[in-house]
């Protein structure tokens, strides 16, 4: 060995030690979840259909099982497919899976701040504050219930003024829902004809429309390339920035008129927290603006879309609408507004609402998670910071829990004796530590708005019911209802 020389021998020894250490590390960590072999830079783009990601994931799960790895471009993602594996991750190992995975489009829109997209101590502090403050302002209590009942009255009267003429109810619904979150966060509702309010809602609706454009769908695969190209994805980003600017103006106005002795709304409560804890870096004007944006967007789009989709489904199924009418008439009558205390006495109506949320499968991919530390799941090793897709669609469409899941059937949530049946598989708001902070508010809004509408009106389609299509328009983030018109006939 003398001919090799001492430096060469030492180098070989070092390389051998490094290889052994790497092997031991890999052996101790275990194997990572399997998946299709990615192509450098572009990942698994050819195995994934951007217009039907759920179909692609279903096929991959048949080959690789309920936990597998894909690559969006160079980004590695672990996909969880099915109730059991999602429960193991988000509930049984909730702390490890409590991170927020950020897709390129979400990062571009929200900058990793606020409640939805932040991580670590920032997320914990902001979420804790938001839940406490919303609860103090009446979330889940009578104060918020009364606000929704009042807004439902405005909505019913606005519908009544259409005089049975057919129209797309989308704007009416989003205006009403948006006003609830505005009253909580901004301190007051807007008039339905307020120009700033209408412009704001118009941008949100435009963003919904642009979600299924090819440029938007491909942004998560190739963000750097798409950033340099024109297209609707640029409008989507610009609209979000405009909404952000609108909220900043409101925040500034609140700061100028702030009175610590009389907090008016969520923004005032946040400003008060900033004043009390000036050394706390988690409570800043930027985090206030982003958290307010999160509450506004999340508190408007999901609920209004669920209501809009629900009315379309009822147009398709008049027999279901008629049963709801009879139950609401028997329990609530016509002389008072529906209230949350009625829900336990309206099992069929409650079942229909749950089935609407299950059937529409609004966020099939869920909002991405991430592991906050090296983690093992079913003997697979998942490195820290790996993005996780805990899919909701396979849970809400599980044929063992919900027979014939492709069929709209309130019986999925009814016992044989007609009482309401709860299901652990009902996860439209996700599960675990990252469950939607506004779940309680959304449930209340959907119930009170829908029952108020059906208490006062029957739904009349403008075309033959057999031609009504209740399949979704699939976008990059959500399932959306197809455009439709309806006549509201006073009862």
Curated annotation (Swiss-Prot):
Keyword Repeat applies: no
Substrates-to-products reaction catalysed: an organic molecule + reduced [NADPH--hemoprotein reductase] + O2 = an alcohol + oxidized [NADPH--hemoprotein reductase] + H2O + H(+)
Membrane topology annotation: Peripheral membrane protein
Compartment annotation: Endoplasmic reticulum membrane; Microsome membrane
InterPro entries, sorted: Cyt_P450, Cyt_P450_CS, Cyt_P450_E_grp-I, Cyt_P450_sf, Cytochrome_P450_fam2
Keywords noted in UniProt: Endoplasmic reticulum, Heme, Iron, Membrane, Metal-binding, Microsome, Monooxygenase, Oxidoreductase
Keyword presence, Manganese: no
Family recorded in the similarity comment: Belongs to the cytochrome P450 family.
Protein name per UniProt: Cytochrome P450 2H1
Organism whose genome encodes this protein: Gallus gallus
Source organism phylogeny: Eukaryota, Metazoa, Chordata, Craniata, Vertebrata
């Amino acid at each position: 060995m003398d001919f090799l020389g001492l430096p060469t021998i030492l180098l070989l020894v070092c390389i051998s030690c490094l290889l052994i250490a790497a092997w031991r590390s890999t052996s101790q960590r275990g194997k990572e979840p399997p998946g299709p072999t990615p192509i450098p830079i572009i990942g698994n783009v050819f195995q994934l259909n951007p217009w039907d990601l759920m179909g692609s994931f279903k096929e991959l799960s048949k080959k690789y099982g309920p936990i597998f790895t894909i690559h969006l471009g160079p980004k590695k993602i672990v996909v969880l497919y099915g109730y059991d594996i999602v429960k193991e991750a988000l509930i049984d190992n909730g702390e490890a899976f409590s991170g927020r995975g950020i897709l390129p489009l979400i990062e571009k829109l929200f900058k990793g701040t606020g409640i939805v997209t932040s991580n670590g101590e920032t997320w914990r502090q902001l979420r804790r504050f938001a839940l406490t403050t919303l609860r103090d302002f009446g979330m889940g209590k009578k104060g918020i219930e009364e606000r929704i009942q009042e807004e439902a009255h405005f909505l019913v009267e606005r519908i009544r003024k259409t005089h049975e003429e057919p129209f797309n109810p989308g704007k009416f619904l989003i205006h009403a829902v948006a006003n609830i979150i505005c009253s909580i966060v901004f301190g007051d509702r807007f008039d339905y004809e307020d120009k700033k309010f209408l412009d704001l809602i118009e941008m949100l609706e435009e963003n919904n429309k642009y979600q299924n454009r090819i440029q938007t769908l491909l942004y998560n695969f190739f963000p750097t390339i798409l950033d340099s190209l024109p297209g609707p994805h640029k409008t989507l980003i610009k609209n979000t920035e405009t909404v952000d600017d609108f909220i900043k103006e409101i925040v500034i106005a609140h700061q100028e008129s702030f009175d610590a002795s009389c907090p008016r709304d969520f923004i005032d409560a946040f400003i008060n927290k900033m004043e009390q804890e000036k050394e706390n870096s988690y409570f800043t004007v930027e985090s206030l603006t982003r958290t307010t944006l999160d509450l506004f967007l999340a508190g408007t789009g999901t609920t209004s879309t669920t209501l809009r989709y629900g009315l379309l489904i009822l147009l398709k199924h008049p027999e279901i609408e008629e049963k709801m009418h009879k139950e609401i008439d028997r329990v609530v009558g016509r002389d008072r507004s529906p209230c949350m205390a009625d829900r336990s006495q309206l099992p069929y109506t409650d079942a229909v609402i749950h089935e609407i949320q299950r059937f529409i499968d609004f966020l099939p991919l869920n909002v991405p998670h991430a592991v906050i530390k090296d983690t093992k799941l079913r003997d697979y090793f998942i490195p820290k910071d790996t993005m996780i897709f805990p899919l909701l669609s396979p849970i809400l469409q599980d044929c063992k829990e919900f027979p014939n899941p492709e069929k709209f059937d309130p019986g999925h949530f009814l016992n044989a004796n007609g009482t309401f049946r709860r299901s652990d598989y009902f996860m439209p708001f996700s599960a675990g530590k990252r469950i939607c902070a506004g779940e309680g508010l959304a449930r209340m809004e959907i119930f009170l708005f829908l029952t108020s509408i059906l208490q006062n009106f029957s739904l009349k389609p403008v075309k033959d019911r057999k031609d009504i299509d209740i399949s979704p328009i699939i976008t990059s983030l959500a399932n959306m209802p197809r455009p439709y018109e309806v006549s509201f006939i006073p009862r």
